[in-house]
Regions:
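Short, charged low-complexity intrinsically disordered segments located at boundaries
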Residues: 23-24, 146-148
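Active-site HxH/HxHxD metal-binding segment of metal-dependent hydrolases
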Residues: 1-50
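Metallo-beta-lactamase
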Residues: 39-47, 57, 63-147
Length: 148
């Protein structure tokens, strides 16, 4: 497993998450109650073989560049794959459910918003998410338009 050091110890010790807050809005509160509330606070502990840091290249699929995106969680990482016009694997840094938007919860919403700006200077045509559908065209511009 590959993970940022700030979250690796959570997994090693069996903690599922740190305290987080729901992003404002009725829809986010409803989605939180349906999908997040009551989830276990613990997970089976696991070994993390590799700790990754910002701007590190991961030797997978011809090279993925890690982009540290704290906010959703302290160790949130997105990956940029330079092939096919650029593909961002945004994970939970943002969501694309009913449009490109913030995820439902963040450990620190303001930090999460600042982290999304890290993608403004990246070149990528496609973005995929932990939640929601992919953006298949002009994804970088959609990030700029949404999170400016």
């Amino acid at each position: 497993a590959w993970m940022h050091p700030l979250d690796a110890n959570l997994v090693r010790t069996g903690r599922a998450e740190r305290p987080h807050q729901v992003v404002p809005g009725l829809l986010n509160r409803m989605l939180f109650w349906v999908f997040v509330y009551g989830n276990p606070d613990t997970v089976p502990p696991a070994e993390i073989e590799y700790e990754i840091i910002d701007d590190q290249e991961i030797p997978v699929a011809g090279g993925l560049r890690a982009i540290h995106m704290p906010g959703h969680c302290a160790g949130q990482v997105a990956f940029l794959w330079s092939r096919h016009g650029g593909v961002v694997f945004a994970a939970d840094a943002a969501a694309n459910a009913m449009g490109l938007r913030l995820s439902i919860t963040y450990e620190d919403v303001d930090t999460g918003k600042k982290s999304l700006r890290k993608l403004f200077n990246q070149n990528f045509e496609v973005a995929v998410f932990g939640h929601g559908t992919p953006i298949k065209h002009a994804a970088a511009q959609q990030f700029r338009d949404t999170f400016t």
